[in-house]
Swiss-Prot record:
Protein name: Large ribosomal subunit protein uL23
GO terms of molecular function: rRNA binding; structural constituent of ribosome
Keyword tags: Ribonucleoprotein, Ribosomal protein, RNA-binding, rRNA-binding
Organism: Dinoroseobacter shibae (strain DSM 16493 / NCIMB 14021 / DFL 12)
Lineage: Bacteria, Pseudomonadati, Pseudomonadota, Alphaproteobacteria, Rhodobacterales
GO CC, alphabetical: ribonucleoprotein complex; ribosome
Family indicated by similarity: Belongs to the universal ribosomal protein uL23 family.
Complex formation: Part of the 50S ribosomal subunit. Contacts protein L29, and trigger factor when it is bound to the ribosome.
NCBIfam families: PRK05738.1-3, PRK05738.1-5, PRK05738.2-4
Entry keyword rRNA-binding: yes
Top-level taxon of origin: Bacteria
């Protein structure tokens, strides 16, 4: 597997919500990442894929809700989010392609 493919395994997709938009005003971008990825892997992937310098990475894991499907209880998957703060002067435009 190439290095670029490994970076795409770490970063799944950008998260575009009201909270993520407010964070982008402070120079942060929010991504959904692989549940087993760590902060150095996320930093390396963002720097390699987008060509920017990363200042800090904060992560959070949201536990999946229990829902019912046709009467039987099921569970949604856990989601890990990464709040990536960029160095001054660096930007990532995640809204292109929408």
């Amino acid at each position: 597997m190439t290095a670029k493919a490994q970076h795409y395994d770490v970063i799944r997709k950008p998260i575009i919500t009201e909270k993520a938009t407010l964070a982008s005003e402070n120079g942060a971008v929010v991504f959904e990442v692989a549940i087993d990825s760590n902060k150095p892997q996320i930093k390396e992937a963002v720097e390699a894929l987008f060509g920017v310098k990363v200042k800090a990475v904060n992560t959070t894991i949201t536990k999946g809700k229990t829902k019912r499907f046709r009467g039987t209880p099921g569970k949604r998957k856990d989601v890990k989010k990464a709040y990536v703060t960029l160095e001054e002067g660096n930007t990532i435009d995640v809204s292109t392609g929408l």
